[in-house]
């Protein structure tokens, strides 16, 4: 077995991971934890604690308060949206406020994802931001996905375990999935700008040493069961009701209520036939699944639809198209062309416009350049479906 690479490195402005993305993916991604000191030197983040509390009061934000009651070794989990008075009654220590999808709610937070786009965009889930007072924590736990934990203001103590035999059993008496036992192998205090990368299923425990904010860039890792359920639903829609169980070779059974081996063989053959997906169908089903997976909100079409000429005129006078933050985007090659996917829906496209949509969250005349008629038509359809929002101010 090869020796694990260094677990702690120093970052820089040019190499926030302390190495090239290629080396990180080769040596650490889904393999080993990594602490990067000063990955983003002087980082504080675009949100202050009061801003985060304000978001937690919004109905469209998924927020939680986690309060640890030391006397009874108990955890109290409260779900938002909250009222301002909820925060006024909190104790001086041992609580944490967490808000998911902050990148969808605040444009400046979405910009923090840029250094992480060496990972496919459809693998990036969200930026969760937490604020914790001294002692604030969510307990020792494991995540089922890769996560980058970027320290903002304040300091947090992180303990992790790299023991391959560490128990992953949960406490039965807690409102959170907290590990029943946790024996750390590494112990650090993270300062603002430090970042800890953890692959899936690495036990870890973070505790605020002083009032602090942590920015969690989480990846998307659908479970096989989720894929199977979604693919089964898509397959059922695709094949309709004409493909059915048949038994033209049926013989008089010895036992009339028995499900015999011949029946199971027919079912197996039927399911194999239904699940026999060619590459194009598999690509389409996965793209539909992954671009709508774990989406907390749906896009809404605009009140007023426009045509291609109106869009072209708007761009000519300086309008900007923004991708809706809730519209997850991906694209696939189809020969020399492409197919674009937004939140589970697809449109044919040129590879040229597919890459522009990939590389730019804001589209103006300078970015778009000279568009083919089909490309302008695509942008118009995406606007009318709510995936692109026009700012004509």
Predicted feature descriptions by range:
Residues 2-9, 31, 344-393:
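Long, charge-rich, low-complexity alpha-helical segments
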Residues 2-27, 41-194, 202, 207-244, ...:
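Active-site region of the double-stranded beta-helix
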Residues 275-359, 380, 391-393:
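Acidic, low-complexity/disordered tracts enriched in E/D and polar residues
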Residues 30-31, 94, 124-126, 335-337, ...:
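Sequence-level motif detector for i,i+2 pairs with an aromatic at +2
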Residues 14-18, 77-80, 194-196, 310-326:
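Short, solvent-exposed secondary-structure boundary motifs
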Residues 232-311:
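C-terminal amphipathic alpha-helical segment
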